[in-house]
């Protein structure tokens, strides 16, 4: 049995190292340095292990299907060597990392997957480790035997259509994460369609306003009985984050962690940066950095959670979202400041109901916002777009925004 790992990022290297440690013949390459390698070793290999960034239309993927070679991802590979009993898998368009980080904090399970440590790296270190994995649609598409005993599907909205051939494929790739669950397993689902229709034999628990698990004020109820009182957290503002806490708490409770311990652990939780991160009050103006917002759905959650009047900074590379949907929040938004590659495309969708300024870059946008801001306003940086037109990643974008705030505002 021989493998070809394609992609030399952290997950690709982790997969390659795991295979070598297990004594398998394996090659590793990528499009930048080893473009022809896969053709040179094609007749020797049985299985192709693709990194999450390799899309279905990549020539290697197409050739593998044509040649009837097995195509899997790093998560599936790691699972085949995993000997532990507890895998929690969390997916959704938004909120995955925060929820996994909460579960890790409540349970001490090793966190990883799409964010942080690759599953293969965890398995190589300890193949019996209890794990909480963030699972993306890219990883879901290349799963086969993977089976989490606890699954979570937080939400679903249009995203990644530059990678998936259709919205249906994006949804099916996420649902595939749970296809091997049995009646012994648990699947926690958003009560809204299409998430609630996810096929699985697992015991299903729905969350949301009309679900089994719901947030009322800041309290969590399960089947109309109080489960946990006051789950509010200063770094996790908004209803969407209360549900992230509620779901993570329920997962931890289902794994045997007491409600008292969950509450105690919540008090010491430190939120991940750039996810609706409150930077502070500057000369009477609140500033929030939500650079992780790469979809309109994430922007909507941020707008829902932010006190008016809002000065919104957004823009970057549009991912096919419907920006006209923010009309529902037009009474909260004082003005919108757009920058980035698709600023004019976004402007065309919202200028008939909002005051819009179009700027050259993020710093220009922030300076224009500073001109317009008054005491009591909230500056919300929630781009709702990919970052790669001007930044290396959403993290880099978030770091730049924080530096610009330090440069132009006095605390």
Swiss-Prot record:
InterPro entries named among the record's database cross-references: Mur-like_cat_sf (IPR036565), Mur_ligase_C (IPR004101), Mur_ligase_C_dom_sf (IPR036615), Mur_ligase_cen (IPR013221), MurD (IPR005762)
Give its E.C. classification number. 6.3.2.9
Specify the domain of life of the species encoding this protein: Bacteria
- List ligand-binding residues for ATP: 92-98
Q: In which pathway does it act?
A: Cell wall biogenesis; peptidoglycan biosynthesis
- Give a yes or no for keyword Cell division in this entry: yes
Localization per record = Cytoplasm
> Enzyme class, one word?
ligase
Q: For this UniProt entry, which residues form the secretion signal?
A: none
| Biological process, per Gene Ontology | cell division; cell wall organization; peptidoglycan biosynthetic process; regulation of cell shape
What UniProt keywords apply to this chain's record, in alphabetical order? ATP-binding, Cell cycle, Cell division, Cell shape, Cell wall biogenesis/degradation, Cytoplasm, Ligase, Nucleotide-binding, Peptidoglycan synthesis
Q: Which GO MF terms are attached to this record? A: ATP binding; UDP-N-acetylmuramoylalanine-D-glutamate ligase activity
SUPFAM superfamilies in the record: MurCD N-terminal domain, MurD-like peptide ligases, catalytic domain, MurD-like peptide ligases, peptide-binding domain
Recorded catalytic activity of this chain's protein: UDP-N-acetyl-alpha-D-muramoyl-L-alanine + D-glutamate + ATP = UDP-N-acetyl-alpha-D-muramoyl-L-alanyl-D-glutamate + ADP + phosphate + H(+)
The record's section on Gene3D superfamilies has: Mur ligase, C-terminal domain, Mur-like, catalytic domain
Q: What does this protein do?
A: Cell wall formation. Catalyzes the addition of glutamate to the nucleotide precursor UDP-N-acetylmuramoyl-L-alanine (UMA).
Which protein family is named in the record?
A: Belongs to the MurCDEF family.
Please name the NCBIfam families in this protein's record.
Answer: murD
Q: What is this protein called?
A: UDP-N-acetylmuramoylalanine--D-glutamate ligase
Q: What organism is recorded for this protein?
A: Hydrogenobaculum sp. (strain Y04AAS1)
Recite the lineage of the species: Bacteria, Pseudomonadati, Aquificota, Aquificia, Aquificales
């Amino acid at each position: 049995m021989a493998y070809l790992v394609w992609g030399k990022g952290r997950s690709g290297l982790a997969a390659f190292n795991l295979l070598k440690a297990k004594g398998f013949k394996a090659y590793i390459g990528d499009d930048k340095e080893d473009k022809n390698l896969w053709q040179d070793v094609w007749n020797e290999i049985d299985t192709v292990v693709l990194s999450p960034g390799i899309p279905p239309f990549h020539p290697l993927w197409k050739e593998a299907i044509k040649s009837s070679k097995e195509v899997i991802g790093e998560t599936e590979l790691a699972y085949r060597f995993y000997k532990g009993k507890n895998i929690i898998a969390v997916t959704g368009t938004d909120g995955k990392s925060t929820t996994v980080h909460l579960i890790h904090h409540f349970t001490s399970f090793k966190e990883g997957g799409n964010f942080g440590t690759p599953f293969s790296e965890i398995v190589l270190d300890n193949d019996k480790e209890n794990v909480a994995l963030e699972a993306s649609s890219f990883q879901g598409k290349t799963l086969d035997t993977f089976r989490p005993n606890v699954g979570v599907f937080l939400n679903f909205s249009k995203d990644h259509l530059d990678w998936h051939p259709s919205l249906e494929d994006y949804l099916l790739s996420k649902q595939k994460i749970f296809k091997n669950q049995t009646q012994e397993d648990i699947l926690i689902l958003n009560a809204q369609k299409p998430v609630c229709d996810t096929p699985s034999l697992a015991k299903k628990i729905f969350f949301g306003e009309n679900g089994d698990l719901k947030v009322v004020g800041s309290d969590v109820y399960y089947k109309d009985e109080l489960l946990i009182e006051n789950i509010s957290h200063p770094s996790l503002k908004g209803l969407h984050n209360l549900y992230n806490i509620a779901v993570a708490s329920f997962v931890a409770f289902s794994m045997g962690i007491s409600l008292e311990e969950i509450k105690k652990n919540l008090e010491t939780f430190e939120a991940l940066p750039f996810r609706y991160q409150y930077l502070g009050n500057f000369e009477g103006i609140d500033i929030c950095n939500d650079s992780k917002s790469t979809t309109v759905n994430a922007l909507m959650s941020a707008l829902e959670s932010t006190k008016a009047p809002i000065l919104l900074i957004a823009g970057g590379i549009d991912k096919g979202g419907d920006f006209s949907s923010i009309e529902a929040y037009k009474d909260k938004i004082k003005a919108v400041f757009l920058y980035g590659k698709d600023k004019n495309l976004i402007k065309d969708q919202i200028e008939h109901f909002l005051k819009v300024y179009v700027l050259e870059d993020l710093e220009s946008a922030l300076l224009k916002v500073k001109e317009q801001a008054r005491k009591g306003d909230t500056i919300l940086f929630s781009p709702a777009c990919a970052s790669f037109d001007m930044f290396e990643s959403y993290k880099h974008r978030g770091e730049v925004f924080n530096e610009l705030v330090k440069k132009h505002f006095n605390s």
